[in-house]
Amino acid sequence: MDIRMIATDMDGTLLDAQGQFDNNRFEKILDQLEERHIKFVVATGNEIGRMRKLFGQDLMERMTFVVANGARVFEGNSLLAEQHWDKALVQDVLAYFAGKERDYHLVANLHDGAYALEGMTFPMVEKFMTQEMAKE
C-alpha cells in the first residue's frame, strides 16, 4: 500500500510546547515527501492567518491546510472549499448560549480570526499556545 498523504494537527503535535518548530528540518522533510509524491496536510482549529505567520509564504505553497476545524480548506494560499453555518443557525446557537458563553468557552471563528468575550480564559488552549499566539 502506498502512502499518499500525511496529515497532522498543529498545537502539541507538529509544534513544540512553545508553539514552534524547526523550520530547516521541516523543509527537508517536505523535500523528501515531495520526492515520494506524498502530500502534507495540516489540520487545525486555527485560522489560515496563524498558519501564514508560522510557515511563511514558501512553505505555505507546498502544503494543504484544513483550518478552522474543517470550515476551510486551502491548497497553499488558495481557498479550495469553505463551509459555514447559515445566519439562522448562528442566531439559534447564540440565543442558546446567551449568558453562558464563558461557561462553554464559546468562540466565533470567522475569516479574519476567532472571537470570544473579552476576559474569557481557555486553560486547555493555553497549554499549547503562548500568550502572544493566543492574542493574534
Q: What residues fall within each predicted segment?
A:
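Short glycine-/acidic-enriched loop or helix-start segments at secondary-structure transitions
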Residues: A17-Q18, M51-K53, G76-N77, E118
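Catalytic-core regions built around general acid/base machinery
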Residues: N24-H37, D92, Y96
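Substrate-recognition element of Asp-dependent hydrolases with the DxDx(T/V) motif
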Residues: L30-R52, N69, L106-L110
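Metal-dependent catalytic neighborhoods of phosphoester/phosphodiester hydrolases
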Residues: R50-M60
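Short, small/acidic-rich helices and loops at N termini and domain boundaries
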Residues: T64-V67
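HAD-like small-molecule phosphatases
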Residues: A71-E136
